[in-house]
Curated annotation (Swiss-Prot):
Pfam families: DUF440. Belongs to the putative dsDNA mimic protein family. InterPro entries: dsDNA_mimic_put, Put_dsDNA_mimic_sf. May act as a double-stranded DNA (dsDNA) mimic. Probably regulates the activity of a dsDNA-binding protein. This is Putative double-stranded DNA mimic protein YciU.
């Protein structure tokens, strides 16, 4: 995969894209009660956080997860408005290079 550092999604674009994907696929991949909980609580306690890909992604993909080009977005709920997300609904691995659309999701079980 040939990737260009100058052709990457910004951090905000990456978060927005991951959240859009989450909203599109959540109803098909989460328990209906979890979807309802997320929708009711998101305004107060919800969030999406951007990270370098965690090492356990290597169990799910067979390519190098260079943090210059790949990001993990965690979507879920926190105990408070400014707290860390501790109730994870999805972990989304995205390629930030605009010409390489790639996404893997680990859903809450």
């Amino acid at each position: 995969m040939d990737m260009d550092l100058n052709n990457r999604l910004t951090e905000d674009e990456t978060l927005e894209q991951a959240y859009d994907i989450f909203l599109e696929l959540a109803a098909d991949n989460l328990d209906p009660a979890d979807v309802l909980l997320f929708n009711l609580q998101f305004e107060e306690r919800g969030g999406a956080e951007l990270f370098d890909p965690a090492e356990d992604w290597q169990e799910h993909v067979d390519f190098d997860l260079n943090p210059d080009f790949f990001a993990e977005v965690v979507i879920g709920l926190a105990d408070s408005e400014d707290g860390e997300i501790n109730d994870v609904f999805a972990r989304i691995l995205l390629c930030r290079e605009k010409d390489h659309k790639l996404c893997h999701i680990i859903w809450r079980e």
